[in-house]
Amino acid sequence: MPDRAGCVGLLHETFLQTNPSPLSSTSKRLALILSAAVAGFTLAQFVARQNGAPSWWPDRDRDRQARYFKEVLQLVKENYVGDAPADYASLTRSALDGMVAQLDPHSAFMLADEYRETEEEMTNAFTGVGIQVEQRDNQVVIIAPIPGTPAERAGVRRNDRLVKIDGQPLATPTLAATIKLVRGEPGSLVTLTVYRPSQSKTIDYPLRREKIRLESVRLATLRPGQIGYLQITQFSERTGEEFASALAGLEKSGLRALIIDLRNNPGGLLDAAIAVCSQFFDQDELIMYTQGRTPETRDNHYAPGGHRARHYPVAILVNGGTASAAEIVAGAMRDTKRAVIVGEKTFGKGSVQSVIELDNGEGLRLTTARYYTPSGITIHEKGIAPQVEFEVSPDDEARLRIQQARPDLSVAPEDDFKPITDLQLAAAEEVLTGVLAAKGR
């Protein structure tokens, strides 16, 4: 448990300072902070520029390369004698897939059905087993199983490496291809084979696919000392509305301080993260900004009006499964001294993916920007270090997830399951109790 005197000092610095000065202009753009299987839409616009080059030069170079591609495409189509598909459509799709996949792990060319699934996820419903994944070092890593889903119920854990699907090894895996293999009809079976680094063993999980309906804000409760608690599982279209409603309910019950649990939250929509932060920011105050490849692509995101900013003490719980849009919330709240961060270092995904529908119904997911906290800090590949660090073992984390997902532990599959104390949550409560005492509340 953290030292009380140290926590009070930290919280005094965090919460008892003057709020930052609000900024004046407002900018709003639908964007996406993508984590693995979570996706959404944005409109991306680019200005082609080269230092000192004529304005027509980029088009000339593009056309030259297009002619080169056309020449190779025709040669393959007319002369290839192997078994692989060599029609123009197949060759073009393979070329596009390879072109985008080599950029970074988050960019991808999507066929029409993959694009529709991406759309579906942001409506809080899709068919699968309930895992959210990330490509890392040519491996598919499970960021977190979604609470209450087949994967979570079976015991799949954060940081498991997905190595086989239905017995087939994932050779040079891509996220899009992996997700397509995991998805399927409701009620159908799929076996995931994972390697668990913490135990140095491989485990098979036979799972039955089902319709996954995501409740992004859950477990809103008032704990002892009138400290509110709620969990955000991901950031989707309705998260801002659900969060505001949960806050209002807790406040009616006498809320004095708040714990926001972002552990194992893989991210989601940028607009949803902005909506959550805006509950604590004054109108027109900068929450975060994104920066593309040229200076004019900076896009500031400010708090909208229409509601009062909350100024009670806040603690945010994070761990290695906290990624992307969830890191935006943690970073913005910490950067502006509106919250203290408790737990473990976050994942470190600070890139923005734009999802663009193509004319034929297929899609392109492309990394177009990095995001930054109000003071200009990026967490990409760095993560956010908590101010109150408190690590939990993988075994204890798995047990805690069972407790959160299924309060009725009689349905837990593990034999002799015994509830355990959430020490990270207890640490956050200790911190907030200290700041409430320091403020005389």
Language-model regions: role of each:
Residues 15-107, 140, 431, 435-441:
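Terminal targeting/pro-maturation regions of precursor/exported proteins
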Residues 19-20, 60-61, 65, 79, ...:
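Cleft-lining beta-strand/loop regions that shape enzyme active-site pockets
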Residues 77-143, 189-191, 195-219, 423-432, ...:
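Extended, small/polar residue-biased N-terminal targeting/export presequences
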